[in-house]
């Protein structure tokens, strides 16, 4: 008999963005686009549809990076990854430990 759990908090997969250097190959990639790629890959690895996500927790350093997103990069990334608009997104800045939280 299969057990289905429909309440609780689940981490089904995680992915990270690549490291880069200032002015390097990623300098023209918008932060929310890069975050959206990582989110889509996590959905794929966890075999989860974006529509099933209730809340996005996105770890990111330098959230106010001078881009048009400003501090909204996690929210914009969630939307670009296909998470429904009515679902919240939380940006976490713990410097090097951002992704671990």
Regions found by a protein language model. Name each.
Residues 49-57, 85-88:
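Short acidic capping loops at alpha-helix termini that bridge into adjacent secondary structure
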Residues 62-101:
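Conserved catalytic cysteine-centered active-site region
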Residues 1, 57-61:
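Short intrinsically disordered, low-complexity coil segments enriched in acidic
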Residues 2-32, 41:
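Condensing-enzyme catalytic core mediating Claisen C-C bond formation in acyl metabolism
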Residues 32-47, 73-77:
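Short, well-ordered amphipathic alpha-helical segments that serve as non-catalytic structural scaffolds
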Residues 25, 29-31, 51, 79, ...:
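Active-site loop-to-helix "anion-binding N-cap" substructures in soluble metabolic enzymes
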């Amino acid at each position: 008999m299969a057990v289905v759990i429909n309440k609780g908090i689940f981490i089904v997969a995680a992915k990270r963005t690549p490291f880069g250097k200032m002015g390097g190959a990623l300098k023209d990639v918008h932060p929310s686009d890069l975050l959206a790629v990582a989110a889509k890959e996590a959905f794929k690895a966890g075999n989860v549809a974006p529509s099933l996500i209730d809340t996005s927790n996105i770890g990111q350093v330098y959230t106010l990076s001078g881009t048009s997103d400003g501090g909204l990069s996690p929210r914009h990334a969630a939307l670009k990854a296909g998470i429904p608009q009515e679902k919240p997104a939380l940006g976490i800045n713990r410097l090097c430990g951002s992704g671990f939280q």
